[in-house]
C-alpha cells in the first residue's frame, strides 16, 4: 500500500511538472494580439485581399521578428482600443494614437515614435484660411469622435457647431460636399485627402498647436513588454527602419513636407 502511494505521488509530481512546463511554453509561443482600427490608410488599412496592411502593420511585423513572437492583428473599433488592453483581449495597441494624459491614466505608452501636427481640410468655397476663421457662429466643423482634432475643437472652437462622425472618410465627405466648412485632423491625413479632392477642398497647414506624439500602448503595468517595445523602437530607428517605412508608404508625403519646410513625421529627438 505504501509503495502504491509513493508511485501515485511520483506520477502526480511528474504530471504537474509537465503541465507547468506546457503552460510556460504556451505563454511564450502564443501570438501577441495587436489591436488597431483598420480604417486609416496608409497606417492601418487592408490590402486588396482584405488582409491587414499599412505602415503600422509592417512596424508590428518587424517587432514580432525582433521579439521572436507571432503577431496577430485584430481590427478593433476606435472606442474599443483601450478597453481591449484593459480586458486583456489585446496585448498591444498601435493605431496612430496620440499620447495624452487621459489615455496614459488607463494604459502605458511606449516612447514616442512619431510627431504629428493638426491641420484643417477646408471646403474650397468656405473662405476658411486660418483656424481662427472656423471659430465663428454658423461654421460647421467635422471631427472624428474621440480624436485629438475632436478634443481640440471642443475646447478651443466653441463658437462653431461640431459634426461628430465615426471615421475619417465620413468627415472628408462632409467637407468635400459642402456640409461642413472644415475637418481637423493630422497633417498627413489632411494632405492626402486634399490631393484626392483638389477641386472641392483646400488644406490649411498653419500650425495652431504643439506637435502631438504617437505611441504604442500596452496594458497598465506590463513593464516587460513595454521595455521590449522601447528597445525595439530605438534599434529600429538606428537601423533605418523608419526610413524604409517612409519609402514604402509615405514617399510622396515626405517630398511634399520637405518642399513645404515641415518637420517630418518620424524626425524625433534621440
Q: Positions of the model-derived regions?
A:
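Periplasmic-binding protein-like
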Residues: 38, 115-122, 187, 191-233, ...
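Extracytoplasmic small-molecule ligand-binding "clamshell" domains
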Residues: 28-96
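Short helix-initiation/N-cap motifs at beta->coil->alpha
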Residues: 72-84, 128-129, 145, 163-177, ...
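Flexible hinge/capping segments at coil-to-helix
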Residues: 122-140
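Extended ligand-binding regions for polar small-molecule ligands
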Residues: 57-66, 125, 132, 145-147, ...
Amino acid at each position: 500500500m505504501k509503495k502504491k502511494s509513493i508511485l501515485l505521488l511520483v506520477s502526480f509530481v511528474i504530471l504537474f511538472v509537465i503541465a507547468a512546463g506546457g503552460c510556460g511554453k504556451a505563454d511564450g509561443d502564443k501570438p501577441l494580439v495587436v489591436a488597431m482600427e483598420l480604417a486609416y490608410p496608409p497606417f492601418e488599412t487592408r490590402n486588396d485581399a482584405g488582409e491587414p496592411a499599412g505602415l503600422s502593420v509592417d512596424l508590428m511585423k518587424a517587432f514580432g521578428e525582433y521579439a521572436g513572437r507571432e503577431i496577430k492583428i485584430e481590427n478593433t473599433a476606435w472606442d474599443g482600443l483601450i478597453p481591449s488592453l484593459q480586458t486583456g483581449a489585446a496585448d498591444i495597441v498601435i493605431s496612430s494614437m496620440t499620447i495624452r494624459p487621459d489615455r496614459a491614466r488607463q494604459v502605458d505608452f511606449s516612447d514616442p515614435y512619431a510627431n504629428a501636427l493638426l491641420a484643417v481640410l477646408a471646403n474650397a468655397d468656405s473662405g476658411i484660411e486660418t483656424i481662427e476663421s472656423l471659430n465663428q457662429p454658423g461654421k460647421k466643423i467635422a471631427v472624428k469622435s474621440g480624436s485629438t482634432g475632436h478634443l481640440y475643437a471642443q475646447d478651443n472652437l466653441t463658437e462653431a457647431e461640431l459634426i461628430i462622425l465615426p471615421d475619417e472618410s465620413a468627415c472628408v465627405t462632409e467637407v468635400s460636399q459642402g456640409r461642413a466648412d472644415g475637418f481637423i485632423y493630422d497633417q498627413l491625413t489632411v494632405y492626402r485627402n486634399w490631393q484626392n479632392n483638389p477641386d472641392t477642398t483646400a488644406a490649411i497647414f498653419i500650425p495652431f498647436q504643439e506637435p502631438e506624439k504617437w505611441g504604442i500602448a500596452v496594458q497598465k503595468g506590463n513593464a516587460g513588454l513595454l521595455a521590449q517595445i522601447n528597445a525595439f523602437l530605438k534599434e529600429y530607428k538606428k537601423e533605418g527602419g523608419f526610413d524604409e517605412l517612409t519609402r514604402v508608404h509615405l514617399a510622396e508625403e515626405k517630398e511634399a513636407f520637405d518642399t513645404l519646410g515641415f518637420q517630418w513625421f518620424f524626425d524625433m529627438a534621440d
